[in-house]
UniProtKB/Swiss-Prot annotation:
A Gene Ontology biological process term: rRNA base methylation
Binding locations of S-adenosyl-L-methionine: 42-44, 62, 86, 108, 115
Function statement: Specifically methylates the N4 position of cytidine in position 1402 (C1402) of 16S rRNA.
Gene3D superfamilies the record matches: Putative methyltransferase TM0872, insert domain, Vaccinia Virus protein VP39
Any GO CC annotation of this UniProt entry: cytoplasm
Record's protein name: Ribosomal RNA small subunit methyltransferase H
Length: 320
């Protein structure tokens, strides 16, 4: 999610990545019911609302308290906001008795530009602030708290698994040694330590890039959240309902791609297995079909460099 909204009033300017394409992929119906699972600062939600008819409905979700405050600026009666993780979207839909009636779901994954650009949130190695990184600061351990209690092996596993950091063990050892003598509480402290401990310099990338990504993903359980959200979307979509997902790195995109592929194939039956037609029917068939993917063009990347790694994938629920 890279959403460069400047203010939270109704007239603000924004640069949501693949904005038009992601919403167009939902195939908006005038009276449809839609979910924006990652409200952010509302770029996608506002565009969806502009295309809905008077009987349409949009349910937005976000776990970031600042996003909830931004959503309060929207007074449209067709719009409602839920404060919570998008991984619980099926739960929210069940409470509303709308399972099987959702015409489209949009998920814009990862961290948003307002979160990155606010030093007090602790997401960025480019700005000094509290070493926090939580999407919802009221829940769970901050990055500083986790790094203080985690072992070098645990930290190395996180850096390797979620950041694909080649020097994970070396950096983890340096983090633990530093915290034993002078606990880190600021993003600049962690970024400087990683820069000094890393034996390799990439002139195009800060040495702390992968480590900050990895710690953020772990602290917020981002990949597990994505898996649960996709399963929930599959449960609640109406026949011919659309799923539109924007990812920003290979770990996210791999989950989305594999999810769509899995539900597009139907049951995999070993050759020669003796099954009756009734048994085959009971196993069900494919429940999704892929309707393509997109990446930002050169013009969008030039305007918004953070869009460079984004991938937009679409799927459609097959009617039953």
């Amino acid at each position: 999610m890279v959403d460069n909204n400047k203010t939270v009033d109704n007239n603000y300017k924004h640069t949501s990545v693949l904005l038009d394409e992601a919403v167009k992929g939902l195939n908006i119906r005038d009276n449809g019911i839609y979910i924006d699972g990652t409200f952010g600062r509302g770029g996608h939600s506002r565009l969806i609302l502009s295309q809905l008819g008077p009987e349409g409905r949009l349910i937005a979700i976000d776990r970031d308290p600042e996003a909830i405050e931004a959503a309060k600026q929207i007074t449209d009666p067709r719009f409602s906001i839920v404060h919570g993780p998008f991984s619980d979207l099926a739960h929210y839909v069940r409470d509303l008795d709308l399972v099987g009636r959702i015409d489209g779901i949009l998920l814009d994954l990862g961290v948003s530009s307002p979160q990155l650009d606010d030093a007090e949130r602790g997401f960025s190695f480019m700005r000094d602030g509290p070493l926090d990184m939580r999407m919802d600061p009221s829940r769970g351990l901050s990055a500083a708290e986790w790094l203080m209690k985690a072992s070098a092996d645990d930290i190395a596993w996180v850096l390797k698994t979620f950041g694909e950091e080649r020097f994970a063990k070396r950096l983890a050892k340096a983090i633990v040694e530093r915290n034993l003598t002078q606990p880190m509480t600021r993003t600049k402290e962690l970024a400087d330590l990683i820069a000094n401990a890393s034996p390799f310099r990439d002139k195009h990338k800060h040495p702390a890039t992968r480590s900050f990504q990895a710690i953020r993903i772990y602290i917020n359980s981002e990949l597990e959240e994505i898996e649960r959200a996709l399963d929930g979307a599959h449960e609640v979509l109406a026949p011919e309902g659309r799923l539109s997902v924007i990812s920003f790195h290979s770990l996210e995109d791999r989950i989305v791609k594999n999810f769509i592929r899995h539900h597009s194939r139907g049951p995999q039956v070993p050759a020669g297995l003796p099954l009756t037609e009734a048994q085959l029917r009971s196993m069900g068939g494919r429940t999704l079909k892929s309707v393509g993917k997109m990446m930002p063009g050169d013009a969008e990347i030039a305007e918004n460099p953070r869009a460079r790694s984004s991938v937009l994938r679409f799927a459609e629920r097959i009617g039953e």
